[in-house]
């Protein structure tokens, strides 16, 4: 499971030699099928709220020849434009991963355009039973109305900034099925 969660392999199989005569020194065979170094996905579609769009997602599993994965997703549509990215270290000792992420989005409605940006720095811990994610996040949202001719519509222009400290945790206790 750890090998599969790393995202570096397309397929993992582990077999144990079942010969009872070799029980003290049983052979374990691990077969791995490595995932490609880079992967790109192109999408074309229509969103119910924002209309037609195209997207491109790119994943590099060893960016700058470092033990890190870089993921970027760009979406371009008639009313929505967005970018989301994450740089994550491969598993470190103790099964931790360091994370750095960001996002930017512009969404247009009939009355205004909303811009949002986010940056996140954190650390993740993932095992079969436990998942923990700690991160600090900064976010900014700007709302810009199209009609600023009246005092009421000009007053709807807003800027909001936030900084948060976050912790997510999952614990699983499952019977073998």
Where are these regions (language model features)?
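Gram-negative/organellar outer-membrane beta-barrel architecture
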Residues: 1-177
